[in-house]
Amino acid sequence: MTNIEMRMNIYVKRKHVLLGVTGGIASYKIATLASLLVKAQADVHVIMTENAVNFINPITFETLTGHKCITDTFDRNFEFKVEHIALAQLADVVMVAPATANVMAKLAHGLADDMLTTTVLASRAPKIIAPAMNTAMYENPVTQDNIELLKHYGMEVITPSTGHLACGDNGTGK
């Protein structure tokens, strides 16, 4: 068992984890995270933004978690409940990964216009935001201000690692 797997076992075992996946190229990496969370005995529910489904298929997360992957606020094929509130109340922790500049800006300013942002804003659970984007976008003063706002509102923002990015650049953002 790796060090990260041991830590995950300690922190997420028997916890309800809400995993928000946004539309960045790093979306495919989140399947591994979902798998590790499930392996650590977390109950993982995934919400994907409209753009995220262009990078990875919801069936991947459904297979890994055993739960329907939520991709639409107005899904008409559901049991009667206010789904974003039910998921928000269920969550012991909310993770948004990869977090695009767009979704971080929405969360920093209280904009709730899709299933992910409405659910995150409705949840009282601790929130972990993992930005992933091009270095220029990440270092943009507007993005940095939004990150500071997210921290001010009590969200934990993980600093992205540095390396070779999908666009061919080397820098921070992966």
What are these model-predicted stretches?
Residues 2-128, 134-174:
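A cross-family phosphate/adenosyl-ligand binding-site feature
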